[in-house]
């Protein structure tokens, strides 16, 4: 086989024409558009970290998703590979595709076994083609079982633009980036089938997140992207803007997928209202503390019932800093609960909730461990792909040397065998790189759920804060009643009554009334948050099982499918070089 005329036909003219291409071997990794150079194989442009790999590979197409992406044929000669997709397509348009050609396509095992599980109904509804499990997870992280399967909402973030802040100063305002947010939906709350776009800056997203956190206490609200001030200074501007665009799109899609948040007025205003965002901006901590310090003297001296917690504010946590006296009272109540000898008037007695809370904590630790192992796996696969690429390039250089020095057919035969081995190694490297990109996308589910664990902890913190408010108000009422009784007893001893004490008694009674109303509102808020926690934990448990099952299916399909592809590549090389084993045995 190796001594055949075809083997001898490893034309030196073609090889000489490609000598310069060997150093920069054009083996398009992503479909032929990006050549694989020695620097790529050595890992100069690769990402070693799992998190950085996620951002750079987020747009790579899922190999499980039909239809397959046409790429450079894996069975083609790497020395003669076309430099672009158009060259490849034109070179194959004039001849039939044989069954022996091995494309970088969805693994055959995956097509046969698991092809139904990776269907993206959302993309079919919206007329778009986005079949990656990563996008599916982002869109379905919080699915509503009660919503109709025909309902959809698709949000895209695109077209970042730099704009100038309006300023009256001579220097001028700062520049900032705005993003075009386009929404396509048929939800009745958004006016039925419609499409609309607005431009928003990152500060608007922060305002939206703050408003949702205040309004929907007890819900597991997906965390917003971080400000990333350091990264904005270190990273390239274009890369940073693109990374933020992707993060904002994922965040808004998660919000729109939440069964409650998707119908919120805040999200509707954010997505629909043109111009400046009409939602009130969040007040910074320093301003809130300053407001609290201004009110503190009146609260301490009890002027006009100022020490009472307003009913309008009892629904929000005291840690915001606007009411320092309430903050001090709840801090004292918290210390009393932990270190005091007396039992608080209301305690957390929901054993089922306490068990779920402990399980969530354990789950978070398990996800952290699994995420670390996933990062190690990605790094190992990346190293294997780079090593295979280096091996292939080394054999290509050796092939070049053998052909330059060849004076007889056996030398050319050996050179041809080395070329086949180099081809197999480079194809295996390409398979490893593609496998790694899909592994990142599938196992990215672990990182997504780490973010959701933060949201769960925030929902539980809302419950604890609401309970602490109830405990503080219940403890304060007996104290106020005792003060009134003492003042009434002292006033009764004075003939005609003590006017100052009578006025103080009236103020305390007004404070008691306000505190009683605040207590009732706080109890209702606490019960509402408890119900929100219960429904959210049930929803997350249900969705986690489905998401983790999809993650494992996709991971296994890719591992088996690409192992099958690489096995076929090496089996072909073993068959082509089997004559050496026969010669060794015969000798």
Swiss-Prot record:
User: What positions does the domain BAR occupy?
Assistant: 331-586
Q: In which tissues is it expressed?
A: Ubiquitously expressed but at a lower level in flowers, siliques, and senescing leaves.
Record's keyword terms, sorted: Cytoplasm, Endosome, Golgi apparatus, Lipid-binding, Membrane, Phosphoprotein, Protein transport, Transport
Question: Biological process GO terms, please?
Answer: developmental process; protein maturation; protein transport; seedling development
Q: Where is the composition biased (Polar residues)?
A: 42-59, 123-134
Bias kind Low complexity: ranges: 135-150
Q: Where is this region: Disordered?
A: 1-78, 115-151
Q: Where is the PX domain?
A: 157-277
Q: How is loss of this gene reflected in the phenotype of the organism?
A: Reduced rosette size and inflorescence length as well as root gravitropism defects in snx2a and snx2b double mutant. Accumulation of storage protein globulin 12S in dry seeds.
> Membrane topology type, per the record?
Peripheral membrane protein
Using the record's annotations, give every residue carrying the modification Phosphoserine. 144
| Gene Ontology CC entries for this record | cytosol; Golgi apparatus; multivesicular body membrane; plastid; retromer complex
The GO molecular function terms of this record are:
phosphatidylinositol binding
Gene3D superfamilies reported for this sequence: Arfaptin homology (AH) domain/BAR domain, Phox-like domain
Family the entry assigns: Belongs to the sorting nexin family.
Binding partners and assembly: Homodimer. Heterodimer with SNX1 or SNX2A. Component of the retromer complex which consists of VPS29 (MAG1), VPS26 (VPS26A or VPS26B), VPS35 (VPS35A or VPS35B or VPS35C), VPS5/17 (SNX1 or SNX2A or SNX2B).
Domain observations: The PX domain binds phosphatidylinositol 3-phosphate which is necessary for peripheral membrane localization.
Q: What is this protein called?
A: Sorting nexin 2A
Q: Specify the taxonomic lineage.
A: Eukaryota, Viridiplantae, Streptophyta, Embryophyta, Tracheophyta
UniProt lists the gene as SNX2A
